Every structure is written in C-alpha cells, then in structure tokens.
Amino acid sequence: MFEINRLRKNERLSYRKKVIRYLIYKLKARVIFLFLKINSKLFNLYVKKEFNKRVCFFVPTTIICSKFKKDLTIYINPEYLNLNLKDWLKVDEKSIINISYYFFGDGNWENISSDISKSIVYKELLDLKNVNMDYKSSKHYLSYVQKMNKNNPTTKQHKILNTYEAIDSYFERFINLYNSIKEKGVLKADNFKKEKENKAIGIAVNSNGEILKLPGAQHRVVISKILNLEKIPVEIRLIHKEYIEKIMNLYNLNYDGAILKIVYLMQEKYQVEKSDKR
C-alpha cells in the first residue's frame, strides 16, 4: 500500500517549479497521445502496461480526456460532493506529484481529503450572505486588508491580494459568479472562455465508488451547494485502481469499456436528491 500525504510547508514547490512540472507533463502526454492515435486496442494495451507498474498515480489525464471527450461529463446533485482532494502530494516520502495530472490512482485517499464545508471559500460565501453581499463589511475582506497592511497578503486564485483593488476585484468576481449561477446554474465548461479557472469541475471516484472533488472550481461547487442546486455538470478525471478493476471483473470489460461503465454508474448514483435515493 502506498503512503500518500499532503506536503509539509517546507516541501511546497515554488510557482516556477510547478509550471515546469506542468509543461513536462503536457509534453509527455502529447507524445503518448500521438503514439497511440487513440486506437482502442493500443489504448487498452498501454493502460494495462501502466497498471502493472508499481506507481501510485498513472496514465496522464489528458490521454483519457482526449479519447473520451464529452463522454466523461455527467450531471450530479452537488449535495453529494462533500470532500476535496489536495493537489500536490507526496508519495512514499519521496515523489511529489500533482493528483490532477493522472487519471488512475492507488493507495488510501482519506489523508489527502478535506471537508468542503470547512474550506475558506465556503466560509467566505456564508460571510458574504450574512452582510447581504456588502463585501467591504465582511470579516474576510477586513482580514485580507489587515494582512495586506502587514505585508503578508493572501493569495487567491493565483493572484496576490496586495492592493485594495486586488481584494475588491476578488470579491466582486465572487459575487458576480454567485449571481450568475443563481440565475443560470453552473454552465458546462465549453460554454465559456478556455481559461484555467474555467475548467470543468473535476471529480474523482474512490475505491468504494464514492465521488470527491478534484482541485479547482471551488467557488462554483461551494455556490451550487449553498444555493441547493439540483444538478451541476462535472467531469470524471480520476478513478481509483481498485474500483476500475472491480468493474472490469464484474462486467467482463476492458479498460475503455470499464471507464464508460463507471461514468454511467456515477450518473445513475449521484444525479438524484438524497431524499429520493433508495
């Protein structure tokens, strides 16, 4: 069993190192993609070979997403989405990886998940609602101003809140997003600009067939939960090794067939309200 832990403060990577790792990941994934040509037979042979390696996370997510495209998107009730997975992790006290880079994973994920309702974003939105969206009166706004004045600014969505304009902009975008989702719901990723923060809401399926939220899209998920939306679009981007092997054995499927079967099972399991669940 792999040991998976969150990074300690002194182990966290700089932004530059994260960018370098991301570019290397994209290059490797592109080479594999071109080699496979997304032929079903080659695809299953490649995935089988990766499954036989002793690694905790494997097969680049972009390979799977390029093959299945929109087939990985389902609609779920956000009431079921209660846990976040961390992004940068340490495996067996040596390898530092980003969980979002890989479509399959192994090991125990309990130590790398956290409650969405205890997240800063969730608390920010409750705080905003308590002051009727008058963000300059909110506790978090005042806290970020105080940190700015002490030369210890907060970073939100890859932006440093080191000026009043930056802090105001963050809260104004948050409120605009809240109002948009309240009016239109959560839109699919292909309905807006291809920006990093507008990627589809990614979810993972653990060894028990339960869903967790992948890093990113925190504001959209929190807003949808607090607004009690009935459904939101999400994209399956990580599946536990034990669960897909269980589905393969149960239904006598190859890897590609098992992925689509899991998509179907997750849609059936998580699209209805909990009160209607049998």
Question: What is each model feature region?
Answer:
Residues M1-L7, Y25, L36, F43, ...:
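Extended hydrophobic/Leu-rich segments
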Residues F35, L42-F43, K48-K49, S143-K213:
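Short alpha-helix boundary/capping and kink motifs at helix termini
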Residues L23-A29, F33-S40, V47-K86, D92-S95, ...:
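A short, basic-hydrophobic beta/loop patch
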Residues R16, I20, K28, K118, ...:
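Short amphipathic alpha-helical segments that mediate assembly, nucleic-acid/protein binding
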Residues M1-R30:
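Boundary detector for helix-to-coil junctions that initiate low-complexity/charged tails
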Residues S137-H140, A166-S169, R173-N176, K246, ...:
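Exposed alpha-helical structural elements
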Residues F104-Y164:
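Extended, charge-rich helix/loop segments that form flexible
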